[in-house]
Amino acid sequence: MRQAGRALPEYRAIRAEHGFHEVVTQPELTAEVTTQPVRRYGVDAAILFSDIVTPVMSMGVGVEIRAGVGPVVEQPLRTAADLDRIRTFEPDVDAPFVAEAVAMLAADLPVPLIGFAGAPFTVASYLVEGGPSKSYAHTKALMYGEEVLWHDLLARLADVTIASLRAQVAAGAEAVQVFDSWAGALSPLDYARYVLPHATRIFAELADLGVPRIHFGVGTGELLGLMAAAGPDVVGVDWRVPLDHGVARLPADVSFQGNLEPAVCLGGWEVTAPRVRDVLARAGGSPRHVFNLGHGVLPAIDPGVLREVVDLVHAEGRTDGTLADGVVVLP
């Protein structure tokens, strides 16, 4: 998940002087913000600070990231003519600042860097809706009513994702994560028909890079098996599904990531600690488990609680199939 953000005083200090667009397009700022959680929390990996629409924004599609709203598209893409705005993405020309930031981080970070990109469905939902949505009505109307056009759009966006992540690995990223934040809006039937072919191609075309490939979506408990079928090495499980239930839906050779409910941390450490141990217990000490939040860090979370989460996982997490004393599944 995105580790940096408004929960960190040091991030807020940077944002007091620089807009979000500056932070994701100026390599020095990107590198600093990406590194902040590593310094403060002692996490085992960093994830590139960026936004899922950064590539299409840098291609001139007409996307603006508005504070408190998210990505907003001036002219939504809803016709065949609109697709011409999704041209071939050239990372070294359109967004050279990303590789520059990755190279800086790869040289200086004490932990591995995870590259970051949006999945075609989620990026398409922003481009078609014109911004965040609760119903995805325009997106689904295009998907159901113009299937050929829909697959053309997602194929182009898959090309963008592939190019972006390949460039990040070339610059030094040691793993990559594909975020399908809004895939949970789809039924398994629709995901399999309208999204899975494109997700499968993404992971296939990243396979030769030899780095772990992570697939994550929000509200995707019913899609976990399909997300694994796309071919990633790791599938992220959000907080809505008990981790052991989610793992049961995955093939035995696929690793899993998750899945502490982020908002639990708002309750303080006494509430959070047993929930951390519950996640560890449900993982069963598996070497395939990557402990993580079930989504991003909420702005109101106390950084001190997150530091305690990391320390507890380091102290009591296991990878040999055993559990530390006191690590139990909550009733």
What residues fall within each predicted segment?
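A charged helix-plus-loop insertion that forms the helical arch/lid used to bind
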Residues: 63-79, 133-140
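A gly/proline- and charged-residue-enriched helix-loop-helix capping module
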Residues: 68-108
